[in-house]
Structure formats: C-alpha cells, structure tokens
Design a protein with these regions (language model features):
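Active-site neighborhood of HAD-like aspartate-dependent phosphohydrolases
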Residues: 2-51
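A metal-dependent, Asp-based hydrolase signature
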Residues: 55-92, 102-105, 110
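Short helix-capping segments at alpha-helix termini
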Residues: 37-42, 69-74, 113-114, 137-141, ...
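Short, acidic loop-to-helix structural element flanking the phosphoryl-transfer center
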Residues: 8-9, 88-120, 126-130, 158
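Asp-based, Mg2+/Mn2+-dependent phosphohydrolase catalytic module
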Residues: 1-12, 47, 112, 125-126, ...
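A general structural signal for well-ordered alpha-helical segments in protein cores
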Residues: 28-29, 57-61, 79, 83, ...
Length: 232
C-alpha cells in the first residue's frame, strides 16, 4: 500500500503514455480487432482489449490472439502473422481517436513553470510513440522519451526509468514517476523513484488502489500540485 509521502528536491517527472497522458484505447482496439478479422477471428469488446494494455505491443498481440484460442494455440507462425497485420493497422489509426486526458496540459505547464524536467517512459514502440506525442502537441514538452524498444528490457523492470533519469541527468531519488498500472509502479519503485498513480487508466483490469505508490491522484494536474507542494 501507500508509503509515507516523500519530500525532497524533485527535479524531474517521468510519465507513462497509454492510460496516463492519453486515452489510446480506441485506436489500439481498432487495430487489434482489424488484426483478428484478418486472421479469421471475431472482434473483441473494447473493454477486453483494454485489459491487454501495459506490457508492450507484442504482449498485446499475444493476448489478443490467445484470448479465445488459448496461448498454446498461438504458434510462432500465427504470432508473426498477427504482428504483420497489427503494425500496419495501428499505423493507419494511431492518433485518430486518441485524446489527451483532462488535466494533462495544465499539469505539465505547472511542472514546467517550476523548472522540472519532463520525460515519457512507455512500453509502446518508438514508431508509434513519437508520432502520437507529436500529433497531440506533447512531444515538444519532453526532454526524454524512452520507448518499449529503446532498451532490451521494458517496464516493469527498472531499466527504462533509470535510462530516462540518465538522459535528464537526475538521480532516481530526485524523480517522480506517474503512471496508471502495476508496470509503472514496479518499474519506478525498483529504480528508486517516487511514484504517483492515476485511477482512470488501464492497469490490466486491476484495481489501482492495490498499487504500491506514494499517492493516488485524480489527474496529472493534481499530480503536479502534489509534486510542487513538496519542492523547497
């Protein structure tokens, strides 16, 4: 459960993308269902696909294929066919129906006004992340972007958080990570960052109240207020 709130000289904030900065489920679900139709499978409800998000695109593809087939039926050949179908479908719809969550722009502005460095740490591949952030007008605010294919290991391992801290030239103890899922919380905790969670994201269908975080905040604007209230 929640730790006591840390205090100190925070210098950087690392934000998750899907389910934290933006609601990307409409586009992800459209691409996943188009992939399934290509492979002769029926479409899944968007709420089912929402529970697949968090551990990267390959995991999403595997779960979208194995949902009714069973993982033992998803052969390497079928997985590669799914991957070959999903990527172009997602490129086609990426950003079409995704929206920036309320409070995000206000929160980022508050953090920037107080001189904090900003970065994105996501399990989403670079080829989808950068166009999406650019289209949403968020990329220009980010001094570091670490994607699911930037390093050999992704969240929930600490590597992406540590790499982002290195890029921003800050220590993990000077950094707050904000996310919506257990992957964000585990990665940030292992890296030594403070952790905030928003309750409106995906978290693979799990209750955000069960996450090991310093606080659950209603949105990014409240997260920013939490952070700046602890600055010297």
């Amino acid at each position: 459960m929640n730790h006591s709130s840390p205090t100190g000289s925070f210098r950087a904030v690392l934000l998750d993308l899907d389910g934290t900065l933006m609601d990307t489920i409409p586009d992800i679900a459209a691409a996943a269902n188009a992939m399934r139709v290509d492979l002769g499978l029926s479409m899944l409800h968007v709420d089912i696909i929402r529970s697949f998000v968090g551990k990267g695109t390959d995991n999403l593809i595997m779960r979208a294929l194995s949902h009714d087939l069973g993982s033992e039926m998803v052969t390497p050949d079928l997985f590669e066919k799914g991957r070959a179908a999903f990527y172009p479908h997602y490129h086609e719809v990426n950003g079409q129906h995704s929206v920036v969550y309320p409070g995000v722009r206000e929160g980022l502005r508050l953090l920037m006004d107080r001189g904090l460095k900003l970065g994105v740490v996501t399990n989403k591949p670079t080829e989808f992340t950068l166009p999406l952030l650019r289209q949403a007008g968020l990329l220009q605010n980010m001094q570091a972007v670490v994607c699911g294919d930037t390093l050999p290991r992704r969240k929930p391992l600490p590597d992406p958080m540590l790499h982002a801290c290195d890029m921003l030239n800050v220590a993990p103890t000077e950094t707050v990570a904000i996310g919506d899922s257990i992957n964000d919380a585990l990665s940030a905790r292992a890296a030594g960052c403070a952790v905030l969670a928003v309750p409106y994201g995906y978290n693979e269908g799990l209750d955000v109240q069960d996450l090991d975080v310093d606080a659950i905040v209603s949105d990014i604007e409240e997260a920013a207020q939490w952070i700046v209230s602890r600055l010297p």
